[in-house]
Amino acid sequence: MADTSVQKLAAEVGKSVERLIEQFSEAGLKKGQADTVSETEKQQLLDYLKKQHGADKAPTKMTLQRKTVSTLSVPAGGGQSKDVKVEVRKKRTFVKRDDSELVDQAELEAKAKAEADAKAAAEAKQKADAEAQAKAAAEAKAKAEANKAKEKAPQAPAPKPKAELKAETPEAAAARAEAERIKATQEAVLTKKQKEEAAQAAEEAKKLAEVNSKRWAEEERLRLEAEKNGDHHVTTSKVARAAEDSSDMDDEKRGRRARNKPTNKKRGGKDARDGREKHMRNRSTAPQSMAHGFNKPVAAVSRDVRIGETVSVAELAHLMAVKATEIIKQMMKMGSMVTINQILDQETAQMVAEEMGHKVVLLRENELEEQVLGDRDDNVKLETRAPVVTIMGHVDHGKTSLLDYIRRAKVAAGEAGGITQHIGAYHVETDNGMITFLDTPGHAAFTSMRARGAKATDIVILVVAADDGVMPQTIEAIQHAKAGNVPLIVAVNKMDKPDADPERVKSELSQHGVMSDDWGGDNMFVHLSAKTGEGVDELLEGILLQSEVLELKAVREGMAAGVVIESQLDKGRGPVATVLVQSGTLRQGDIVLCGLMYGKIRAMKDENGNAITEAGPSIPVEILGLSGVPSAGDEATVVRDERKAREVALYRQGKFRDVKLARQQKSKLENMFANMEEGEVQELNIVLKADVQGSLEAICDSLTGLSTAEVKVNIIARGVGALTETDATLAAASNAIMVGFNVRADAQARKTIEAESVDLRYYSIIYNLIDEVRAAMTGMLAPEFKQQIIGLAEVRDVFKSPKIGAIAGCMVTEGIVKRSAPIRVLRDNVVIYEGELESLRRFKDDATEVRNGMECGIGVKNYNDVRVGDQIEVFETIEVARTL
């Protein structure tokens, strides 16, 4: 290869001339910009560069990473959508080429280019020579044929041309031939170059197809699977690639615009906003290749909606695949106002779903509870058990006194005020067998407790005082007995009194469906006296006779089951529950499930406080060891596993909480508009603590029943046990009164009560508690005012006074006229002015009041149109005490 200049070599290797001269200088060769470089000098420079950088040295690399994040909105079911973040990561590696490689590459490229040019020139010359020879031969042949034809053709006189054509000179012919040859050579080179480019493009396309064939096949397989399975997430890769390509194009466009656009000064205000808006309009958005995930059905879709015990509006909408607003509209049509987070009970949710055309499947969420309660080793052998007898009747009709005589113990003295406020459960051994008695309170407030007693009993004894007859609680007891389908025995008490009238009792009871067996009815009547014991033996015989007719039997061996009669929180013993065993045998150490509570029985005591280890059917017993205070009336069941008992108790607590919340929300929504219309209602806040659960429920029901449209009793906290410091703090913060029923406040609570001046009241009789709360509510009523006329004066004459104006000379015809009282001026019995007196005189002296039949002068303040014949009415406003 011929020598080349330094400048040309620098252009070939892609370096600046100064850098190349510097490298020549480092290699020991002094070169200038116009000097030539021989092959030997090139080789010497290449050897130096290889030695300097190392022949096997790895090239320097630089890796750049770029991460772009985009967000896709995909359907999530139920008419909702969710956002999915797509993150695209790109990695690019740049390799720094070595100088020796650049020199080798430049040398090879130059050599290849020279060889290609030489080869192309030789081929072009050869082709041009061949074409010239062929053209010359063709011209010679054509000329010979033309001469031959000319000789054969007859001579004809040729027309005389208008202008003689100039003959072509040899120099012009040679120039034209040379131009045609050069043109043909260029066309040949261009054609060859196009063929080479086409072949190279085909080769590259073939290589690209080989590289991408596997990836295309995999994408096609994934697409077919996605169409088959309906999975929309597979298309995320397509959208991500489209977003990436779009982002690359945006970056390239922004860079090109930034390079081409001249720099302007910073703009502000409207120009800047216009520019930003235009930029946002011109921005290209990523192509959305994902198809819509939901097509609106042309017909109504009926789904199987699985509904549990409780469900919120949002969850129900998701189950039915509709928007929550549709359910809210449907419930508004049904007359209920709900919110999206409101809890619906199973019945309401079922009604809504069926109204909207769906099939409802009610879930049994208490399968675990049924499994635990069904796993019992009950003995199928039934044995006769003692009857459970409930004594009912009106207050002070002698129920507890009757039971006291039967038990030979003074129980009535232990109850405050001589009335029963707890359910007393006792079993009595008689000569004819054992009988279990439940003594229920007779006060109206204990309706729920009495209803509980009727559910747990076999026979009801209705005690009616012979001197008092049928009373409201007597009628209520009859209703409870009939509702429980329990046989009724009437005990006509207080027969020792002189004014006793048993026939009147029979007549009054017959009006309520209780007919004596003497009158052809089904109910046994026993005349007795709890004070003298007259007729008590006949009553016991009647009870045992009735129990034989009922054939009362129960399983004696096996796991026990019963009902909670009463419960309380004892300060030393913890939660204590009185349980009436109905079947099986309850033993110390058993795992008991009582309503929302559970526990292992640590101790058992009978009604007299004696420790026992087991209790059979129809035996009342106190048990200790529960996790909390159960509600009276809950079923008590012995289970095998304490862990499963705990799970069932927690499930019941959650279910109770959900149902309670649903009930509260329903009450709030129903009363919302009523409260708006009625205005502000006075509230009497109460913190209530009682000794036992039954008394607590009865007091709460009674106090809640006292609420009126103007004053509402709000029991902000209730519980069983002593009043604690927490209760006192809550009462102080809520401006509430603290009420203790048979309980007292501890030392810390008393300190807080004194410091915060909280109103604390103790009660042992429910009458007094209700009466004082009613009095407190009466004091909270809005005052009522009434106008009372105290005097009337008739105008007989009118005088003019320069200081006051018109003075009415009057005669007091009724009552008394007071100086400080407001007045009305009446004309023809029509009120024309209402105001107050400015002066009241008797003769020339000022007077504070003028009585009936006396004359006086009256000056009306700010009113001068007093005429003869008018009447001046004097009145005063008094406050009238209101009652509930």
Curated annotation (Swiss-Prot):
Residues given in the record as GTP binding sites: 393-400, 439-443, 493-496
Keyword GTP-binding carried by entry: yes
Chain intervals for the UniProt region annotation (Disordered): 110-291
Gene3D superfamilies: P-loop containing nucleotide triphosphate hydrolases, Putative DNA-binding domain, N-terminal subdomain of bacterial translation initiation factor IF2, Translation factors, Translation initiation factor IF- 2, domain 3
Record's compositionally biased regions (Basic residues): 255-268
Region G4: start-end pairs: 493-496
Chain residue ranges for the region called G5: 529-531
Pfam families: EF-G_D2, GTP_EFTU, GTP_EFTU_D2, IF-2, IF2_assoc, IF2_N
tr-type G domain segment(s): 384-553
Region spans: G2: 418-422
Family: Belongs to the TRAFAC class translation factor GTPase superfamily. Classic translation factor GTPase family. IF-2 subfamily.
Protein name per Swiss-Prot or TrEMBL: Translation initiation factor IF-2
Lineage: Bacteria, Pseudomonadati, Pseudomonadota, Gammaproteobacteria, Alteromonadales
